[in-house]
Design a protein with these regions (language model features):
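Positively charged, small/polar-rich N-terminal and surface patches that mediate targeting and assembly
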Residues: 1-117
């Protein structure tokens, strides 16, 4: 149901952020929080060379985008993100989806759906 509140967290390459923001805005997502984060998954970091010496970077720079939706269907957000982010390569990212039981807008005291609009 579209009126349920759902948190969607997307962790992906920094280079995909602008395209993702644009695509999400086109389907009605007009609020999100963005973090620069470090992490790794299957790729386990990368090997680099500097002045002939090889070294490993264990934590890779990523971007984490969070949003709580109640009017835009979760499947629309996921499908949009997948179409923008998927390259078929390791490092495309992850999408986490979880229910939200309560939202409170601090400025007005509005709660739940009204706090998100």
């Amino acid at each position: 149901m579209a009126d349920e509140m759902t948190k969607i967290e997307i962790v992906t390459r920094q280079s995909k952020l602008e395209a993702l923001k644009t695509a999400l805005n086109e389907i009605g997502i007009n609020g999100m929080t963005v973090y620069n984060v470090l992490g790794y998954g299957v790729q386990k970091g990368q090997k680099h060379k500097y002045r002939g010496v090889e070294y490993s970077v264990d934590l890779l720079p990523k971007v984490k985008i969070e949003m709580v939706v109640c009017t835009v269907p979760v499947d629309d957000v996921v499908n949009t993100a997948m179409s923008v982010l998927r390259t078929g390569e390791i490092g495309d990212g992850k999408i986490f989806i979880s229910p939200v039981s309560k939202v409170i807008k601090v400025r007005t005291g509005e709660t739940d759906r009204e706090a998100l609009l």
